[in-house]
Amino acid sequence: MFKLAINRPITVLMFFLALMIFGLISAFSMSVNLFPNVSIPLIKITSKINGDLNFVESKVTKEIENALSEIDGVKTITSTAYDNFSVSVVEFKLGKNLEVAANDVRDKIGTLSLPSKPEIEKIGSDSGSAISLFLYSKDKLQLMREINDKIKPFLQRVEGVGKIEAKGFLEPQIRIELKPNELRKYNLNALDVANIIKSQNFKQALGELNNNQDNYIIKGYFEATNLEELSNLRIKTGVFLSDIANISSLYEDEKQSALYEGKEGVLLELGKITNYNTPEMIKNVKNALPILEKQIPKDISINMLYDKSLNIHKHLSQVIFDMVLGIFLTLVIVFLFLRNLSATLIACIAIPTSIISTFFIIDLLGYDLNRLTFIALTLSIGIFIDDAIVVIENIAKKLKTYPPLQAAFLGINEIGFSVLSISIVLLCVFIPISYMNSIPGLFFNALGISVASGIVISFLVSVFLIPSIGARFLNPKENKFYEKTEAFFEKIEQKYENLLYKILQNKVKFILATLVFIGFSFALATRIGLDFLPMEDDSEIQVLLESKKDLSLEAMKEKSLNLLEKIKNDSNVKYAFLLVGYDDAKDATKAKIYVKLKNLDERNLRQSAIVSLYRQKFQDESLKIKILELPKIEGAGIDDPVQFLILGDDLNTLKEAASQAKEILGTNARIVDISDNANTTKDEVALHINKEKAKLLDVNPQYIAGVLGYSFSQLSVGSMDRGNSKDDIILSFAPEFKKDIEALKRISIKNNQGINLELSSVVDFIYSKDLKTINRYNKNRSVKITAGVNDLSLGAVQKLLLDNMDKILNNNPSLSYAFSGFINLLGETVQGFAMAVALAFVLIYLVLAALYESFILPLIIMITMPLAFGGASIGLFITGHNFSLFVLIAIILLFGMVGKNAILLVDVANKKCHEGLDPDKALLIAGKSRLRAILMTTFAMIFAMLPLALSRGAGYEANSPMAIAIIFGLISSTLLTLLVVPALFKFCFKLDSKLRKIYEREKLN
């Protein structure tokens, strides 16, 4: 194969050109995202039912949970019961197809006998808002109609657009607002009016007419077609609907509000279709907006408030810049070591060829282009050029004594086995990653596949393209710069040889010192914090507000606007908008402020500093205020960094445990915004019927409920056609008659004989408080404790809770606990990392043992891996960074990198020993001959990492610790590889020789 590559240069060149062409096509056609496509299969089940909280929990929520738990692949079930409705979200294990999951849920829910049919919705975690549009018009009703009739349908047709949520949208309605005084005047109540309207305003199929020739369907059209007809609807003799009510075309009562720049409008949050390219979808929407604006009234304004693609492009641009700079620095290092322009240029070919061709492999395997892809390629620059350098150096040596083509063949033939060994070892590091079926596993997988693809291409480039080009263009002549600097390198080699000689004479002491270093660094690692993903400065934060009292929407709006104005006055803020009642229940006591900060170069403080400042600055005794940096992974409830659940059946016991947990978290000043969802109560007017009076006066409780429902709720009594759609006709009291308990007491009811009575004659009214919600997790009642952190790792918070778990649960066997959100993902990360590393070590040993036909040599090579981990730990400790998903990814890559140097050294020493040299002499020759290659590849890798380590641009919070871990790991492992591996080789050589005598025999011919 080597001869074929050298003898047929055009064939080889065309093959790699083809790979690069396909790579370029893939690079420009692949889906682009910030991170690997983390689509958590989530299904949301919403059930509406007339009933109080406990009834909803027992008759709906529990029934749904029991059915869901029987479905294969369910990971967690999170439910919330409210008055009159229930919401359950089931999270499936990764790999479960969302469509299959939805069908499984429908099948199971379909077997239940529920009061009403639940709504089942697919909410894959990647379907969150990609772009947000704020719509405003002075004519509010016109805005709502345009959104319903034109804007939403238009946007839904844009390619890539998935679910559209309209925050602050009010459904257009025909409002019949009753006047209680007029009702009393005519001896009527709301239920009477509702029944009369229903009996006169309807459309109904009434049968068929059939004869021998024709068939006719009989339909009765008895509904009003306009407001005037509805107003003239006769209630009783001489009394029309307009006499007892105000009738208008309006919209539903406001339960949710969206505000921007002091204006109240509607926020449209556009999600993307699962697996669709986010920037492409956003581009499609932006291109469609000018067309949309021409189709709607001019007084409707559209403002773009959120654009996810900006962050994606910002991060990718920064990583690509760091990669290009890393390539340049790497080439400078290579030239300084080789001091040969032709050799440097030939080595240079390996980098773009490997990177561009890798895109084709990644695309072929179904992956997208994301930040981790480019980081992986940046981390691999040293690997790509290292293979080429090893081959070029060997060919250059042969060129001194052989003709070019023969030198190229002998050079690659001699070093090919080492290059193959190195490539296989690197692949062994990344193959185990593919077994990680978890969210962190998707991150590891994306990087692992990218690096593994690059390694395969790099190997092909090194053994086929480089020898082919080197045989024709490599100039072995030494220039003046080479001659002037050669003495420096020879001096280093001589000093290393002298040092190595001393080490070999004191090998036991040095090995013991190395073991002490490993022990020290591992002990140091336990003092380094552990996070899932570092928070990055993306110029956006959110402020969550919750009133401690049960406020109205208007009161909550006023409080939230006061805080919004303070935030907008901050010189670091670009703009901000407010959502009140943003959750599923449209709870008016909850609000959210999205804060868009100015770009990093336009403000004085970093995002984390602003968050800390806001936590100190914005405090209100009547509000719970949380300041959060936006999470980088959406879905599965991961807004709060710290999420801890206590599970049980008794709510009072759960509250006590939650209080204890909050107290323990509060002992650490760096744990902030500590809160729980245990004490969410609402003010309530409880109506208790006096059964004796009701029996005496012959009053039906069901009748009372009907009167009150049509008086104070928003119940439909019909609909009115409006062209392509219908407006519900809603009956209730006018707002001014729904403000206090006196309005209730004045309600007129009738007994079974039709005699008018005051409601207060049979009902007692009591002010009370009741739970807003009952929260459940995996079929247990739950209380969730959430918190943020200031300069503290999530691992430290988890340890604090685990160390005090007996105190929190009070040794109560009915209580249990669970972590969710980032802490849960952190556990999955550590577990997956440990399994991947263990499997990688086993595979590396198996491969090296097979390649070297030795049980001992692989162990000598593998000692470099804990040495690298030790260096990485020291680097993180010195710079004050934590272990995180990105750092652990880097450490896995590091294990592959550092094995290269040991292989280069051991391979030569092993060959020399088999040629008859004693171990000391073999090691001195191996060390001296491989020193430059090892130093050059190490420096090349380090300088490739420097831009990532030193950059303060987008994403540095995650990129910098990763690069620092690699740099320090390379330094420690390289220094100790050059010193420890020879000592270990000598120490183990006799044992290896004895073992070989057992299993080696004269080989068959």
Predicted regions and their residues:
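Solvent-exposed, membrane-proximal periplasmic/extracellular interface segments of envelope transport
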Residues: 6, 56-125, 181-202, 554-637, ...
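Transmembrane alpha-helices and their membrane-interface boundaries in multi-pass membrane transporters
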Residues: 364, 381-395, 416-435, 442-482, ...
